[in-house]
Amino acid sequence: MTDEPLRTLQFLLSRLERISADSAVAYRASGVRGSMLRMVEKLEEGKPVSGQDVKRLTDSAYLLLKKAAREKIR
């Protein structure tokens, strides 16, 4: 696997941790962040991860970031 999934996950982690604790999506974002952190650890250790799992987590993270952004502009 290339470094691209690792960089993407690290980018998303940095954005997810900025979601306000008062946000309606904060609890879910926390769970997604935990899963992403475990996946980043595996990637950094050189252990295999499923491309499908990476896609699922990145899709979830982008969706949560969109929801948090919509919530913020209201």
Regions found by a protein language model. Name each.
Residues M1-R18, A24-Y27, G31, R38-R74:
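Long, non-catalytic architectural segments outside compact domain cores
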